[in-house]
Every structure is written in C-alpha cells, then in structure tokens.
C-alpha cells in the first residue's frame, strides 16, 4: 500500500493553503491509524511557496482560457475556475480516487461483518475508500463539513464556512460486485458553505464520480464551466483530460434498475415493454456509477430506477442522485423523479431517497408521460388563436 501511495503523490502540485487552515482535523470517528505510515496527503505531497494555479482573468473575472483535451487535471481546473479552494478540493479528491482505484484492483473481497447506519454490509474496501476520502477532504483545508453513505452524520473537517465547502459522498457504490470484477465507482457532490440539508442539487458548485473498471476515470463538472469532463488515469499516475460532453442525443440504449417494481407498477412495466418492443439495447451492470456514466460516454440512452408499493426507493438523494443528476444535466442531458428535475428536490434529511431517471430529452419526456401522464419538458401544443 505504501508503494501505491507514494506513486500517487509523484509530481503533484497543489495550491497554497493559508496557515489559518492548517489545524483542520479529521473527525475523531475516522480512524486513520492504519493509513499513518503511508498517508496519501502527508509530507510526500509537494507544497509550493507560491500558488501553482495561474488563471487568466479579464477585469470582470470571467474566464478567458478554454480547456482543451490533453490538459492535466490541474491545468483544466486552473482554466475552468478562479476558486483556488475548489481547485484544491477537487485535486485532493482526485488523489483519493487514484488510490481507491489501485486498491479496488488488489482488494480482498471478504466482508467485515459490520453494517453501516442504513443497514448495508460494509466490505473492507468500503471502509478504506471512506477513510481515504475523509482524509482527502481534511487535507484540502477547504471542507467545512462532510458526510458519507457509510458515515451519514455531519463531520466537522475544520475548513472555513466562508469560501469553504461541504461534501457528501458514496465512497464505493457497487462494492458488492467488486468480486465479480464489474466496474464500481465513487460519487461526490460539493455544496458551498456549511449546509447539506435545506439545499438542492442545483446548489452544487461541483460534482464528480470515479469509475474503476478496465480504465480508471475521474468524471467531473463545475457549476460555472460548461460540460461534463472525463479524465483518464495514465500509467505515470496523472489525470489527463480525454473527453468533454455537452450534449446527450437520442439513441436506443436503456438501463432499467429496480425491475421488481414492474410487478406492481403497471406504468413502469409498460415503459419497459416499450423499450423491448422498439429493440433498445439493454446495458445494465447493477452498478449505478458505470450505468449512468455510459450515458455521458455514449452520449445517448436512459437510466431508470422506479419505485412501486412493494419496491421502495433505495437511492439516496444527497449521496447519489443529486451529484449524478448534476453530471448528467451539465452534459446536456435531463433528470427526473417523475414530475421535476432531481436537482430541484430539497434535501430535508441526509437519508432522503427517491426514484430517478437520467437521459436524453425525449427519453425523459417519455418517462414522465408514461408514468405520470404528462411531461414538464414537452412544449405545449398551441390552441385557438395561437395555433
């Protein structure tokens, strides 16, 4: 593990942190003793005496440099935002994703025989991923509060309220299929300030997912920069910008989750039958991250996870649905919980759950009309004198 950590920190330069933030602590509930000898965010990360992030700005502080394919993660972020705190946080999370990707490839899949607050069994790799992400947020010095699906309580990370962020994450979505060698991933959303309740997904300033499969990728979007962007982990341990998605087109690809709901949700059964009749390509792995990511990569398709009287909502709004909704909508797609975008749902409790669909415009219109009779996205037909 020490070797993997060391290789991750090679040639990484992060923006300077104000000394006033140097005392931030990882929450006491996070035991990092096992990581002490090979800390990912310790002295091995080279800190500069000057900020390494140079952003070209006009007088009104608008960005004047366009990001390009081939940019490193640091180069991309320096061009995409003037917020050095956000740059640092996203860089630190990138370091954590890199290490989690290595551990997923080499992990033992034995269970720890423990469960989280929600009752889900945690695997050893879940626990490690959780620790690494909390450590990354602590080391960023710009995270005020954080919580995870495995530790669903606000943890004070010691960062500032003004100019700082609060982060919610699912450390390893799909950990139960690691042993099958399917792709799995990490999801996180970034909100400004110190609030993770009383907010909506549209309030996010950034969201991202890490995908650990044949390739390790870091897919992110920023509120003030167009598109959703994919970074590939190269052999030398650097993230390289390889894809920009700004449009989700129409195409016959479907990814239906929670199919047991079709037994007592006739409208969902009708929708699934439509996909089959129209000869859609079925691509579903059971891992939400790769299943949603394919819509961004292929630039087409639909993902659904629908509820019924006996198949209740399982997907968590804060940790999964809102961050992925942000990525999809920044990519030019749409999201829905049936009557509105998932980004417009207020997070009232950390454990709020919902049904969801992500996809192209026409697919989301079809989803809403089939399940609820009408769609907010469909343009009204002119009548009377307006016709």
UniProtKB/Swiss-Prot annotation:
EC number: 3.1.3.37
Metal-binding recorded as keyword: yes
SUPFAM superfamilies in UniProt: Carbohydrate phosphatase
Protein name: Sedoheptulose-1,7-bisphosphatase, chloroplastic
Entry's Gene Ontology BP terms: fructose 1,6-bisphosphate metabolic process; fructose 6-phosphate metabolic process; fructose metabolic process; gluconeogenesis; reductive pentose-phosphate cycle; sucrose biosynthetic process
Catalytic activity: D-sedoheptulose 1,7-bisphosphate + H2O = D-sedoheptulose 7-phosphate + phosphate
Family affiliation: Belongs to the FBPase class 1 family.
Cofactor binding notes: Binds 3 Mg(2+) ions per subunit.
A cellular component annotation (GO) from this entry: cytoplasm
Residues holding Mg(2+) 2: 149, 170, 172
Residues annotated as binding substrate: 173-176, 284, 314
Native species: Spinacia oleracea (Spinach)
Gene Ontology molecular function, alphabetical: fructose 1,6-bisphosphate 1-phosphatase activity; metal ion binding; sedoheptulose-bisphosphatase activity
Pathway per the UniProt entry: Carbohydrate biosynthesis; Calvin cycle
Names of required cofactors: Mg(2+)
UniProt KW keywords: Calvin cycle, Carbohydrate metabolism, Chloroplast, Disulfide bond, Hydrolase, Magnesium, Metal-binding, Plastid, Transit peptide
UniProt-annotated binding residues for Mg(2+) 1: 120, 149
Pfam families: FBPase, FBPase_C
Subcellular location: Plastid, Chloroplast
Binding-site residues, Mg(2+) 3: 170, 173, 320
Cystine pairings recorded for this chain: 109-114
InterPro entries to which the protein is assigned, alphabetical: FBPase_C_dom, FBPase_class-1, FBPase_N, Fructose_bisphosphatase_AS, SBPase
UniProt subunit comment: Homodimer.
């Amino acid at each position: 593990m020490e070797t993997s950590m060391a290789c991750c920190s090679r040639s990484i330069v992060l923006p300077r942190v104000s000394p006033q933030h140097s005392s931030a602590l990882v929450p006491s509930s996070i035991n990092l003793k096992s990581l002490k000898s090979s800390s990912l965010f310790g002295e091995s990360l080279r800190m500069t005496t000057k900020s390494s992030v140079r952003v070209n700005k006009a007088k009104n502080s608008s960005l004047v440099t366009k990001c390009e394919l081939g940019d490193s993660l640091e180069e991309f972020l320096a061009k995409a935002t003037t917020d050095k705190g956000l740059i640092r946080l996203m860089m630190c999370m990138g370091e954590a994703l890199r290490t989690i990707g290595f551990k997923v490839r080499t992990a033992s899949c034995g269970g720890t025989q423990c469960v989280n607050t929600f009752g889900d069994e945690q695997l050893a790799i879940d626990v490690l991923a959780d620790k690494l992400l909390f450590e990354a947020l602590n080391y960023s010095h710009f995270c005020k509060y954080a919580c995870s699906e495995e530790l669903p309580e606000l943890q004070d990370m010691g960062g500032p309220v003004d100019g700082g962020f609060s982060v919610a994450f699912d450390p390893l979505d799909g950990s139960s299929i690691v042993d099958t060698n399917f792709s799995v991933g990490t999801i996180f959303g970034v909100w400004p300030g110190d609030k993770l309740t009383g907010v909506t997904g549209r309030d996010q300033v950034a969201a991202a997912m890490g995908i650990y499969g044949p390739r390790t990728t870091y897919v992110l979007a920023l509120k003030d920069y167009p598109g959703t962007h994919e970074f590939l982990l190269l052999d030398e341990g650097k993230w390289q910008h390889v894809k920009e998605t700004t449009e989700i087109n129409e195409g016959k690809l479907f990814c239906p989750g929670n199919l047991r709901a079709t037994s007592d949700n006739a409208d969902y059964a009708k929708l699934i039958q439509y996909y089959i009749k129209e000869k859609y390509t079925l691509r579903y792995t059971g891992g939400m991250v790769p299943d949603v990511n394919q819509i961004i990569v292929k630039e087409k398709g639909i993902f659904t996870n629908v509820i019924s009287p006996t198949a209740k909502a399982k997907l968590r709004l804060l940790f999964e649905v809102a961050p992925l909704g942000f990525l999809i909508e920044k990519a030019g797609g749409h999201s829905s919980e049936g009557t509105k975008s998932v980004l417009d749902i207020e997070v009232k409790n950390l454990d709020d759950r919902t049904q969801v669909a992500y996809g192209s415009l026409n697919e989301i219109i079809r989803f809403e009309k089939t399940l609820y009779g009408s769609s907010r996205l469909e343009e009204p037909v002119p009548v009377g004198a307006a016709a």
